[in-house]
Amino acid sequence: MEQWTTEIWFSISIAFLIGTLCGVLVMRFFKGNIQQQIQLKSELASAEAKIEEQKQQLERHFEQSANLLENLAEDYKKLYTHFAQNSEQLLPESNQVEFFKRLKNHANGDEDNQPRDYSDGSSGLLKS
């Protein structure tokens, strides 16, 4: 290989300095975009974290609601069983039969008469 002269070394160093200067200028020109990208990434990460937190809150809400409804169903079942057992113990059988007969007769009385779509007297503008 031939010996490189000082002129070649000088032109190589000038080209390196010009390239470095161009690189610095390009970086300064596009630096705003890089900062904007970094800001957008941080906003995206915070939005994703917020969505994940909301999902977890929603899951906890539904889990707690399911547990409360299950407890409510169990308590209602206990209440119904309590009333059923106490009504059998507290009401004599003859009273139970009479009580249910009265309820049945009362319900049957309503079924004998059909509902009417008119009133007994006149009403509205044509009252006499």
UniProtKB/Swiss-Prot annotation:
Q: Is Transmembrane helix set as a keyword in this record?
A: yes
> What information about domains appears in the record's comments?
The tetrameric alpha-helical coiled-coil structure is likely to be involved in linking the Z-ring to the septal peptidoglycan-synthesizing complexes.
Instruction: Give the main localization category.
Output: membrane
Q: What does this protein do?
A: Involved in cell division, cell envelope biogenesis and cell shape maintenance.
Q: Where in the cell is it found?
A: Cell inner membrane
Per UniProt, the ranges with Basic and acidic residues bias are 107-119
Which residue ranges traverse the bilayer?
7-27
Q: Which UniProt keywords apply?
A: Cell cycle, Cell division, Cell inner membrane, Cell membrane, Cell shape, Coiled coil, Membrane, Transmembrane, Transmembrane helix
Family as reported in the entry's similarity comment: Belongs to the ZapG family.
Q: Where is this region: Disordered?
A: 105-128
Q: Which organism is it from?
A: Haemophilus ducreyi (strain 35000HP / ATCC 700724)
Its BP terms in the Gene Ontology are:
cell division; regulation of cell shape
Subunit structure of this entry? Homotetramer. In solution, is primarily monomeric but forms small amounts of stable tetramer and hexadecamer. The crystal structure of the cytosolic region shows a coiled-coil tetramer in the asymmetric unit that is very likely to be a physiologically relevant assembly of the protein.
As recorded in Swiss-Prot or TrEMBL, the protein's gene is named: zapG
InterPro entries recorded for this chain? ZapG-like
Write down the Pfam families for this protein, in alphabetical order: DUF29 (PF01724), ZapG-like (PF06295)
- Cellular-component GO terms for this entry: plasma membrane
Coiled-coil region(s) at which residues?
Answer: 37-75
Q: How does it sit in the membrane?
A: Single-pass membrane protein
Record's keyword annotation contains Cell cycle: yes
Q: Supply the name of the protein.
A: Z-ring associated protein G
